[in-house]
Amino acid sequence: MLVILAFIILFHITSAILLFIATINNAWRIKGDFSMDLWYNCNTTACYDIPKSATYDAAYLQAVQATMILATILCCVGFFVFILQLFRLKQGERFVFTAIIQLLSAFCVMTGASIYTAEGLTFNGQEFKNAEYGYSFVVAWVAFPMTLLSGLMYLVLRKRK
């Protein structure tokens, strides 16, 4: 039981770390010395605000920002709820509330990464016209199945002695 518990905690913490990296880091799109994340366009010397990022034209970018932040927050809240339920649940009960929170986090990651995949090319400046997806984008997509599997594990898991 302790091995399963340690594995689930490690899996959850790894998911949270991946979500933090994907949300904060500036490598969603890369082209040479330029990189773009959800917040800034950067070159080798400085970072600049994304043009028109606060306008209606950038609604997709704001949706990606919101869903990735929400996914990260839900993943962290889910971990604290799991720890709380670990001490409060009766023997034999399932971690349903934690599972729901973690599955919502997975849904938010999937939504944010999907929107960025579909709309990422429509808003980037000329310097990102032929850019490649960066590692933060890949990390976001890796975080999706990890949070999904974590949520499903919580759904199946029962509290034992």
Swiss-Prot record:
Bilayer topology annotation: Multi-pass membrane protein
One example of a Gene Ontology biological process annotation: positive regulation of cell population proliferation
Tissue-wise expression: Expressed in the arches, orbits, pectoral fins, vessels, pronephric renal tubules, and glomeruli.
Transmembrane segments: 1-21, 67-87, 95-115, 137-157
Keyword annotations of the record: Cell membrane, Cytoplasm, Golgi apparatus, Membrane, Nucleus, Transmembrane, Transmembrane helix
Keyword Membrane listed: yes
Keyword presence, Isomerase: no
Protein name listed in UniProt: Epithelial membrane protein 2
Main localization (coarse): Golgi
Any one GO CC term of the record: cytoplasm
Protein's cellular compartments: Golgi apparatus membrane; Cell membrane; Apical cell membrane; Membrane raft
Protein's job: Functions as a key regulator of cell membrane composition by regulating protein surface expression. Also, plays a role in regulation of processes including cell migration, cell proliferation, cell contraction and cell adhesion. May play a role in glomerular filtration.
Family: Belongs to the PMP-22/EMP/MP20 family.
Pfam families in the cross-refs: PMP22_Claudin
